Amino acid sequence: MEATTTVARWTWGRDLEGAPAVESGVGACLRELLTAHQVLHSHRLMVGTPRMSVSVHEAGKKNTYLFRGETQPTVADAPVEAAQEVARRVHEAMSSGEIGSVYAHIDSPGDVLLGDDFRREPGLFRLGGSALLGYVGVDLATRTDFWLPYDLKGRAQPDVYAANAPRLSAALRDLSEALDSDTDPDDPTCFAKPNETGAENYFDEGGNARDVWDSFERHPVRGRAW
């Protein structure tokens, strides 16, 4: 099942001590993002050539962009070289001004294991990257419940969980290693409680998985959002 808002999110981040201003901005953001994408691609949780939405904010000016657009690398399977290539194109297209924060994200289909076959799911994850003042961060979010023991309606899905939860857990572990940062589960959402290895359902006092779909998705009053 897929919700209209985030089911679970995980984050990573670190300081880039001693990095020059340019390297700690656009280039660093894209390098971390594409490094993370390569990890997810290896687990088939993101598939295809990444198409990135990139925003470069001007320092000290609210809602002012030096660059805002979509781009994708031509270099495959080499995140550092791909990030350098895309960063160079972004810098060439940027307006003049001091770089403030940099944000980028990838929305990508991924493969879910159902029975003996993989099924392609559009928008399985959103992968985000950011850079500001020498700090780089990455976040991974999903609106789906393939990683939970019970679906969003509280129904047991042991086969789906057994097939896909270990894939997510392995990806989170590999992301921590690739990004040189501990996996930090984000705050619980109304659908699930993320942890370092995946996510957990909510349960009522009787020990039954809660039907969070009926509570929050039956009559949604919002559009699709992350």
Where in this protein do the model-derived segments appear?
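Acidic, proline/glycine-rich low-complexity IDRs
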Residues: 134-226
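Structured alpha/beta or helical-core interaction and ligand-binding surfaces enriched in interleaved
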Residues: 1-155
